[in-house]
């Protein structure tokens, strides 16, 4: 149960078994300018199945979200032996109950995950640096905050 069954670069989806190491999946899609954002600290040692069981995140979760945000389909064996397939290859599936959200993070209490359909994000083209010169650090902070948080900042400073 540690195979990458399929990677479709055209629709940015992979079908994997739960024993696939997170680092292996990341490196398999890196060449196609895609990436799997959840990055637990134990990425080289943890598996996608473990990530699904615990809804793993990592430092990038603040920007990209956690495992739940990238699982679009599951095959789960329930306690009575019944096999449940939920979700699919569609990135945005909002019909019926969110069974994927129910299973991701349940730590195996609801069933055993045997197959995972994972979505990828587009890899960024790189970081950009910004250099500026300011005379008043307070003014530069206010200017930066208004550029990034414009309307929200106005709500907090309206009555000043």
Task: Specify the residue positions occupied by each region the protein language model found.
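FAD-binding subdomain of flavoenzyme oxidoreductases
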Residues: 3-157
């Amino acid at each position: 149960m540690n195979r990458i069954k399929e990677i479709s670069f055209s629709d940015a989806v992979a079908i994997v078994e739960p024993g696939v190491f997170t680092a292996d999946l990341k490196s398999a899609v890196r060449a196609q300018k895609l990436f799997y954002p959840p990055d637990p600290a134990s990425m080289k040692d943890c598996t996608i199945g473990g990530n699904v069981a615990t809804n793993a995140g990592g430092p990038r979760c603040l920007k990209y979200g956690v495992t739940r945000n990238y699982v679009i389909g599951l095959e789960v064996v329930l306690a009575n032996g019944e096999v449940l397939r939920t979700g699919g290859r569609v990135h945005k599936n909002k019909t019926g109950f969110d069974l994927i959200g129910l299973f991701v993070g349940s730590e195996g209490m609801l069933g055993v995950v045997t197959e995972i359909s994972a979505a990828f994000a587009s890899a960024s083209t790189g970081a950009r640096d910004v250099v500026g010169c300011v005379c008043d650090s307070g003014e530069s902070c206010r200017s930066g905050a208004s550029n990034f948080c414009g309307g929200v900042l106005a709500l907090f400073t309206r009555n000043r």
